[in-house]
């Protein structure tokens, strides 16, 4: 499966994804992943950045409001069209473009930093995407990204429950089994069932790597590893959204920051 085919899947996913996420049903993003991502993000005021796999622009807009001058790309025309419409309504100076992460049309050392929020694990030829990110970042600049946690998002797993039926752990199987474009189908569980029953489920091609493969790939490309985060919901979130309890048992996400060394 190549990036063009992946783009077609995301074009088909985009309408329902945009509708549900903007209604607040992407709870893991809004309550856990994005808050941790931006807490970890360095000061970016007046820096030029690239958002790789921006989707409809939710995290791009948060980044821009922190003072960065942003270019944002996605393989999906539908996502980019929606992001551009939002930019027209509420201008933040973001330039949105439909582009592939594996062939970035930008100059070497063009950006002070790059981010990728929950996109790299959905991109075929991940090594090319990370190599391209390295190429366009200036020496001394950073690359921060979030992915599904490679230790727990595997092809086969089961929850462990106690006598009361409460989840207490996770059994992970087939950790080393590769997914190379296998389609995962789901929809946001926080959305009302009477709404999602009428919707097409998301069909998402997955491209998995083990934890060591991710880290070794970054090192091979030339990045210096800098900081990691495995986000989980804080107590206040759990009081208001107890259904997020699962995220206190295992980390659903991994956030990594690495830096392009100054030669």
Where do the language-model regions lie?
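A short acidic, Gly/Pro-enriched loop at the edge of an enzyme's catalytic core
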Residues: 102-113
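C-terminal lobe and adjacent flexible extensions of AdoMet/dcAdoMet transferase-like proteins
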Residues: 211-263
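A short SAM/SAH-binding and catalytic strip from SAM-dependent methyltransferases
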Residues: 112-126
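Class I SAM-dependent methyltransferase SAM/SAH-binding core
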Residues: 48-52, 56-103
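A short glycine-rich, Lys/Arg-flanked "PGG" loop and its adjoining helix->strand segment in the class I
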Residues: 127-142
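Conserved class I S-adenosyl-L-methionine
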Residues: 1-44, 58, 62, 79-82, 142-190, ...
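Substrate-binding/catalytic lobe of Class I Rossmann-like enzymes that use SAM or dcSAM, i.e.
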Residues: 169-227
């Amino acid at each position: 499966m190549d990036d063009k085919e992946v783009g077609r899947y995301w074009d088909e996913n985009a309408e329902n994804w945009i509708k549900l996420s903007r209604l607040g049903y992407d709870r893991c993003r809004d309550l856990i992943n994005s808050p941790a991502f931006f807490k970890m993000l360095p000061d970016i005021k007046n820096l030029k950045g690239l958002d790789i796999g921006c989707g409809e622009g939710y995290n791009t807009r948060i980044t821009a409001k922190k003072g960065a001058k942003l270019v944002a790309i996605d393989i999906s025309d539908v996502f980019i069209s929606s992001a551009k419409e939002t930019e027209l309504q509420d201008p933040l100076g973001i330039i949105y473009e439909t582009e592939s992460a594996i062939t970035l049309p930008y100059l070497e050392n063009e950006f002070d930093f790059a981010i990728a929020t929950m996109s790299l694990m959905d991109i075929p030829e991940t090594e090319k995407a990370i190599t391209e990110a390295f190429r366009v970042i200036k020496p001394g600049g950073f690359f921060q990204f979030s992915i599904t946690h490679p230790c727990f998002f595997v092809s086969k797993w089961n929850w462990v429950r106690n006598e009361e039926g409460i989840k207490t752990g996770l059994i992970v199987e087939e950790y080393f089994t590769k997914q190379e474009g296998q389609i995962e189908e789901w929809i946001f569980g926080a959305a009302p069932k009477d709404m999602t029953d009428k919707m097409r489920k998301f069909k998402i091609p997955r491209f998995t790597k083990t934890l060591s493969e991710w880290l070794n790939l970054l090192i091979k490309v030339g990045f210096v590893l800098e900081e990691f985060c495995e986000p989980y919901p804080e107590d206040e979130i759990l009081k208001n959204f107890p259904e997020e309890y699962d995220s206190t048992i295992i980390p659903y996400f991994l956030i990594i920051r690495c830096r392009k060394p100054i030669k």
